[in-house]
Amino acid sequence: MDLNKSSGLILHPTSLPSSYGIGDLGKESYEFIDLLNKSGTEIWQVLPLGITDNIEFSPYSSKSSVLGNPYIVSLDNLENNIYNEHELNEIKLPITNEVNYKAVYTNKDKIFNLISERVNYNDNEYQNFLKNDLIKRHLTFITLSEVFESSWSKWTSDYQNFSEELFDMVFDEHKDIFMKNLFIQFEFNKQWQKLKSYANSNNVRVLGDIPIYVNHNSADVWLDKHLFDLDDSNNMSFVSGAVPDDFTVEGQVWNTTLYQWDNCLLYTSPSPRD
């Protein structure tokens, strides 16, 4: 078998320069692709692109394996004139060598809340996007997570398991938050697909990455508890990590959820979740 060698470079989009304190899927990403193409570099490797929490801010500890990171959505690339320059200028930050995640999250959340009030959610594009059942389930979790501001294992029994009835209740009671998150995910998906197509058309392939385990406080664990090693209170029975090696002499504690491997092997179709 012939194997062709390729050159690549690893750089997460968040590490690109930006006026908003964090690299995103906007102009700088396109310019980076141009640089790779010009230098003959064929692979752009990125870290996981999922939603990061406001504690560790780690791409390897996401709240959803399905939804994208809101904070790398390019504000400048939002369409339909749903923002004004004054609003964006108010949240711009100096370009530095480090990301102030708390400031970035606060600023972008403020803009997303403003913009969400101006979006026409009756547009067929949004309605069709929501027809994806997996996206709907994960958005339900993200909305509840934002409402309760706590781990799902601490929620009352009414919110412990997904059902269509729960979705209807969440949608009715927290429609503004749910639709804001829908808008963000719609924009992420559109911007990412456009950026990836641009990369491929310029002879650059995108190499992704996924974490070995998932965050306990995630839609993945909430939706499929039987696939994870949880105790009677739905907390982690054990946590993931790595043994000592040449890089970390004391070993590592990843603090993510272990799998219930026997159940994973039996899992061949979606389980009843109501």
Residue ranges and their predicted role:
Residues 267-274:
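Conserved small/polar residues in nucleotide/adenosyl-binding loops
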Residues 216-265:
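Active-site-adjacent "subsite" loops/lids of carbohydrate-active enzymes
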Residues 2-225, 230, 262-263:
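Acidic/aromatic-lined carbohydrate-recognition and catalytic surfaces
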